[in-house]
């Protein structure tokens, strides 16, 4: 069927901010869909609240709305734009649930909008647990015994039917949110109540436990002529009980018999037909009982998902692009496969002759109080993917690509394992607990002498995978005993098992450099193979490569398929797996670098190992290497690329800390670095050198010191005086950073921090309390400087910049203060000889007085996480311009002007606290947010100043982050001593808006002295009914709670946690409270209007 001509405009709903379970993969799918449908001539309207995405760039869709993704706001966009169709399958659970709400409330019918890609009844049938189960029964496919329940009483009846342990799965939630495994009745009740609360339809499925079963997924694409293909089979190495997003997975499935595979293939196609998915990709999940082969269907996603991003990158088959075109009427046989240059149609099922391994990355260390346990609710924040010719090569590449300091199956300590009497029991106990380290625990168990059968009994991993790991451990023993192989054949055999030079160095008590020299002396180097989706059957025209050391049965080395070009080229190093502090913002910059190089005729070569991202899409750059970002892997691909053509250099300043760590190794190897020199980057990171630079420029810094021993740290701390901030040098995302307020806190920090040394000193900075923090992003070519953005933080200094809301332009700073910040930024950029991007963080004491004091906190001569937000606000492709400057263009040639604009943008951080029980939500100097949203609004006619526009933009940023500010009700206000003067105005604003205000004794007395009367409520420790009781009874709609000091934090912990669980908006800084009060007073939700991004740029 040719494409539909009865529709001309299509609305695509994005996924919103990056949260656990919904990350960059939806930027990747959204970009593919927009590009594919625009190429077909449709007008594309896009809504997404996340500014750090490529899809929200003004040239990706025809009308781009950076607005909150709520049914009310999307309805306003529909009313304004009148699209013919809505495609809800590209934006994860957020888009599906929003589309269903618009269908249910009659918006789609009212404006004549047709849902394409998946109809409402299809989504409902797939996502509603009971309807899905009924559909499986109809097909004669088994699913686990289960009951759908809408109340706790119904769930208790369901429990009698399924027994304990039981799995609880809420309907219509993302990545297992609210679900879990209950081993006893108390846990069961707790999980069911939470699940019912978090499910938008108040429904949970109580399901028999299939813990320990093998888990598989099938990625299926179907068109309206009923052509179906399996793009990829995926096997979870972790057994059932661990969410598939937290599981280590391999593609293709490696341990299915052909009979089982064919059964699963037929079953997944039958599932799509029965559910009614007519156009597009879906994934179907199965569980297999290893004891008797019983096979059951677990669930399906009727949309593009995290697994489909993995399947796309694993095979080279662009699922999202194909799904988008199927949604407008094409059939699979009418579409060409890009990877083979159109030699095969899209109906040609991909086949692969390599093994892909995905390992998730976790951030439990960022959430003190959370247990690093894996369950059916997803907790990982990122993932790495690696490709090898064998499972061993693939899994070892993935382990080093995680960037958690591993070089392979590094040793891990198991508590009690060395006990001569009970050591074996300790190892078996450790194997039974699903943690992020379980793969290494398995390897360690083999080192302790356990057999494959014993390990299998303890952790339910498939014996085939266990034998592979046992072989790796055995080989490590041989290397330890006999040293490095002396022949090329022997060395190649080792490298073909995936051993990194760094791991071999550890095993032989040598250095990585020495191992590399020995390997290269024997001329043992990897070859590069192409991902072609057809296992070499047709010629691949797309340069999408991975490395391997594989060799033939007779020792012959396979042909290298890299085929580097003779062009002028530049290599962009990506950011690797997502983590807190380094995420999609950096991928955004890497993509822009590739686009910019393309525009100036330089070949772009991308290196990255994150399967979720746009940067690892085969058509983002000219050439793509899917490789771990380690010195060894990068130097090997550069060796091949430099054999032909001219390498202009490597770009290291766009991928966050990951590529910067490689800059020195590259420089030593004689590889040119584009942009700011590694020495200048070092100068900005090196405390003492940077201080000299600032002194020379007469720029102030908070009093600070550097300590190389704990005694020195204590002495320096006493000199600076409390409070001060302590942190290790060279970190991203505020890792290990803490505000120290007394000697006790200092000793606690020292006890938990480990060793410090000459190489790894500790930094101390005087903490500027009540200072306003400001971020400045600038472009520099060594001669001229353009200040792209000045962002005023809403939370005061002391909250990590990545976790603070901020406003651009500044909402309260004086014009002369902003000018002074720009002047100092220009001075530093020129002094550091920056070429490309630079970010400065300032703190301003008494910013509103006649004499504000400006201090520089830090300078980063690289891309910062605010770059995409700044680019969207000023309508300039900041990252792309930076890339062109690095390639030699002058800043002056872009004609950038600092022009005032009549709109205001607010960036707000989004946190995953709800997924980590027992974690305090108070903000501090260590970054804990996973993503961000942008609220954008403009000055209306007749408004004086930006105040009203700021209130609306702030309200939108809260709404986009999932916080709906109340318009009436009761607010609870309790603040620390130093904040009391700053809480009077927010309370007055709330009372004027009709709110009742409750306060604890101290805050109430202070407000009364200022002539503001509020009602008293007891603290938790003062007897009942106390504030938490009132909150649990639904008596509070808004919380302002600020604290300091260990005891006060502990006392008020329950208030913040209850607010989170009851979905009550809460603010833990006085500045955040003021912004919220202004938004409530000045911007009720119905007053919010929508406007496309393109119209702001045209101002």
Swiss-Prot record:
Residues 563-962 are annotated as: Carbamoyl phosphate synthetic domain. Mn(2+) 4 binds at residues 858, 860. Mn(2+) 2 binds at residues 299, 301. Mg(2+) 1 binds at residues 285, 299. Its EC number is 6.3.4.16, 6.3.5.5. Binds 4 Mg(2+) or Mn(2+) ions per subunit. Mg(2+) 3 binds at residues 841, 858. Residues 963-1099 form the MGS-like domain. Residues 1-403 are annotated as: Carboxyphosphate synthetic domain. InterPro entries: ATP-grasp, ATP_grasp_subdomain_1, CarbamoylP_synth_lsu, CarbamoylP_synth_lsu_oligo, CarbamoylP_synth_lsu_oligo_sf, CbamoylP_synth_lsu-like_ATP-bd, CbamoylP_synth_lsu_CPSase_dom, MGS-like_dom. Mn(2+) 1 binds at residues 285, 299. One of its GO terms (biological process) is L-arginine biosynthetic process. GO terms for cellular component: cytoplasm. Mn(2+) 3 binds at residues 841, 858. Pathway: Amino-acid biosynthesis; L-arginine biosynthesis; carbamoyl phosphate from bicarbonate: step 1/1; Pyrimidine metabolism; UMP biosynthesis via de novo pathway; (S)-dihydroorotate from bicarbonate: step 1/3. ATP 2 binds at residues 727, 766, 768, 773, 798-801, 841, 858. Residues 404-562 are annotated as: Oligomerization domain. Mg(2+) 4 binds at residues 858, 860. Its cofactor is Mg(2+); Mn(2+). Residues 133-328, 691-887 form the ATP-grasp domain. It catalyses: hydrogencarbonate + L-glutamine + 2 ATP + H2O = carbamoyl phosphate + L-glutamate + 2 ADP + phosphate + 2 H(+). Residues 963-1099 are annotated as: Allosteric domain. Composed of two chains; the small (or glutamine) chain promotes the hydrolysis of glutamine to ammonia, which is used by the large (or ammonia) chain to synthesize carbamoyl phosphate. Tetramer of heterodimers (alpha,beta)4. The large subunit is composed of 2 ATP-grasp domains that are involved in binding the 2 ATP molecules needed for carbamoyl phosphate synthesis. The N-terminal ATP-grasp domain (referred to as the carboxyphosphate synthetic component) catalyzes the ATP-dependent phosphorylation of hydrogencarbonate to carboxyphosphate and the subsequent nucleophilic attack by ammonia to form a carbamate intermediate. Large subunit of the glutamine-dependent carbamoyl phosphate synthetase (CPSase). CPSase catalyzes the formation of carbamoyl phosphate from the ammonia moiety of glutamine, carbonate, and phosphate donated by ATP, constituting the first step of 2 biosynthetic pathways, one leading to arginine and/or urea and the other to pyrimidine nucleotides. This is Carbamoyl phosphate synthase large chain. The gene is carB.
């Amino acid at each position: 069927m040719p494409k539909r001509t009865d529709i001309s405009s299509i609305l695509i709903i994005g996924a919103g901010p990056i949260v656990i379970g919904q990350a960059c993969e939806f930027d990747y799918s959204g970009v593919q869909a927009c590009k594919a449908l625009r190429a077909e001539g449709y007008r594309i309207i896009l809504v997404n609240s996340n500014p750090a995405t490529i899809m929200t760039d003004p040239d990706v869709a025809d009308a781009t709305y950076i607005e909150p993704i709520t049914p009310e706001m999307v309805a306003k966009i529909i009313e304004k734009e009148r699209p013919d169709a809505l495609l809800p399958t590209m934006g994860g659970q957020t888009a599906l649930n929003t589309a269903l709400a618009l269908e249910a409330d009659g918006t789609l019918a009212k404006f004549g909008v047709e849902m394409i890609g998946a109809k409402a009844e299809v989504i409902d049938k797939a996502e509603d647990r009971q309807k899905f189960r009924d559909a499986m029964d109809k097909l004669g496919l088994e699913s686990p015994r289960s009951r759908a329940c809408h109340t706790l009483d119904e769930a208790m009846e369901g429990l009698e039917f399924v027994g304990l342990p039981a799995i609880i799965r809420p309907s219509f939630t993302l990545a297992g949110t609210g679900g879990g495994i209950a081993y006893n009745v108390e846990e069961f009740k707790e999980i069911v109540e939470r699940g019912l609360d978090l499910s938008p339809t108040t429904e949970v499925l109580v399901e028999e436990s299939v813990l320990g079963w093998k888990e598989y997924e099938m990625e299926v694409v179907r068109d309206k002529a009923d052509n179906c293909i399996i793009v990829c089979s995926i096997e979870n190495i972790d057994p059932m009980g661990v969410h598939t997003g937290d599981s280590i997975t391999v593609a293709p499935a490696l341990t299915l018999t052909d009979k089982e595979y064919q059964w699963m293939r037929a079953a997944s196609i039958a599932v799509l037909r029965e559910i009614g998915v007519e156009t597009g990709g879906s994934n179907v999940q199965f569980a297999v009982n290893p004891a008797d082969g019983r096979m059951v269907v677990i669930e399906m996603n009727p949309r593009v998902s995290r697994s489909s991003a993995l399947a796309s990158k694993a095979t080279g088959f662009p699922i999202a692009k194909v799904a988008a075109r199927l949604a407008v009427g094409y059939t699979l046989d009418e579409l060409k496969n890009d990877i083979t240059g159109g030699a095969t149609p899209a109906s040609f099922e991909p086949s692969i002759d390599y093994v892909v391994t995905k390992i998730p990355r976790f951030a439990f260390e960022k959430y003190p109080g959370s247990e690093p346990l894996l369950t059916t609710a997803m907790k990982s924040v990122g993932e790495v993917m690696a490709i090898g010719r064998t499972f061993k090569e693939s899994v070892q590449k993935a382990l080093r690509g995680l960037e958690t300091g591993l070089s392979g199956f590094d040793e891990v300590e198991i508590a009690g394992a060395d006990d001569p009497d009970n050591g074996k029991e300790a190892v078996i106990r450790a194997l039974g607990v699903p943690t992020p380290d379980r793969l290494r625990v398995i390897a360690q168990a083999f080192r302790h002498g356990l057999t494959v059968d014993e390990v299998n009994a303890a952790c339910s991993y498939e014996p085939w995978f266990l034998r592979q790991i046992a072989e790796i451990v055995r080989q490590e023993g041989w290397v330890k005993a006999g040293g490095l192989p002396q022949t090329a054949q022997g060395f190649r055999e080792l490298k073909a098992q995936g051993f990194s030079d760094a791991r071999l160095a550890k095993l032989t008590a040598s250095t990585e450099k020495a191992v590399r020299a020995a390997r290269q002396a024997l001329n043992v180097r990897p070859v590069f193979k192409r991902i072609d989706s057809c296992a070499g059957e047709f010629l691949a025209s797309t340069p999408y490569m991975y490395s391997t050391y594989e060799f033939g049965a007779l020792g012959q080395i396979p042909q290298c398929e890299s085929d580097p070009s003779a062009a002028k080229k530049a290599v962009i190093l990506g950011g690797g797996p997502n983590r807190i502090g380094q995420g999609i913002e950096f991928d955004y910059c890497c993509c822009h670098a590739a686009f910019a190089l393309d525009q100036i005729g330089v070949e772009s070569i991308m290196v990255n190992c994150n399967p979720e991202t746009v940067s690892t899409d085969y058509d983002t750059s000219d050439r793509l290497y899917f490789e771990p970002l380690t010195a060894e892997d990068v130097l090997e691909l550069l060796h091949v690329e430099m054999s032909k053509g001219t390498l202009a250099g490597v770009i290291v300043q766009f991928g966050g800390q990951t590529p910067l760590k490689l800059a020195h190794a590259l420089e030593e190897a004689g590889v040119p670095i584009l942009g700011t020199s590694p020495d200048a980057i070092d100068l900005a990171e090196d405390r003492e050198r940077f201080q000299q630079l600032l002194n020379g420029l007469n720029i102030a810094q908070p009093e600070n010191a550097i300590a190389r021993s704990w005694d020195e740290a204590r002495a320096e701390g006493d000199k600076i005086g409390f409070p001060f901030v302590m942190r290790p040098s060279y970190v991203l995302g505020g890792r290990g950073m803490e505000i120290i307020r007394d000697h006790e806190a200092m000793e606690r920090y020292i006890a938990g921090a480990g060793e410090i040394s000459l190489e790894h000193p500790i930094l101390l900075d005087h903490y500027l309390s009540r200072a306003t923090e400001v971020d400045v992003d600038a472009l520099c070519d060594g001669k001229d400087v353009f200040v792209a953005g000045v962002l005023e933080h809403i939370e005061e200094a002391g909250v990590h910049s990545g976790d603070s809301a901020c406003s651009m332009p500044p909402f309260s700073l004086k014009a002369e203060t902003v000018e002074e910040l720009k002047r100092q930024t220009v001075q530093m950029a020129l002094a550091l000889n920056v070429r490309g991007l630079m970010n400065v963080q300032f703190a301003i004491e008494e910013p509103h007085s006649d004499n504000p004091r400006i201090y520089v906190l830090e300078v980063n001569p690289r891309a910062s996480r605010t770059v995409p937000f700044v680019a969207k606000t000023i309508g300039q492709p900041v990252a792309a311009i930076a890339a062109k400057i690095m390639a030699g263009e002058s800043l002056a040639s872009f004609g950038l002007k600092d022009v005032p604009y009549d709109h205001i943008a607010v960036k707000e951080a989004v946190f995953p606290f709800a997924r980590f029980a027992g974690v305090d939500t108070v903000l501090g100097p260590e970054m804990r947010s996973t993503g961000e949203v942008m609220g954008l609004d403009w000055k209306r006619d007749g408004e004086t100043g930006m105040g009203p526009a700021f209130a609306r933009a702030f309200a939108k940023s809260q709404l986009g982050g999932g916080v709906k500010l109340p318009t009436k009700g009761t607010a609870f206000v309790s603040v620390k001593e130093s904040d009391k003067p700053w809480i009077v105005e927010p309370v007055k604003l709330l009372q004027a808006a009709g709110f009742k205000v409750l306060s604890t004794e101290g805050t109430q007395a202070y407000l009364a002295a200022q002539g503001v009367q509020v009602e008293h409520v007891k603290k938790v420790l003062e007897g009942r009914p106390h504030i938490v009781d009132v909150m649990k009874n639904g008596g509070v709609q808004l919380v302002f709670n600020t604290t300091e000091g260990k005891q006060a934090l502990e006392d008020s912990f329950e208030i913040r946690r209850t607010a989170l669980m009851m979905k009550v908006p809460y603010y833990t800084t006085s500045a955040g409270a003021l912004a919220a009060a202004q938004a409530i007073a000045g911007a009720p939700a119905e007053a919010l209007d929508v406007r496309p991004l393109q119209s702001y740029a045209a101002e």
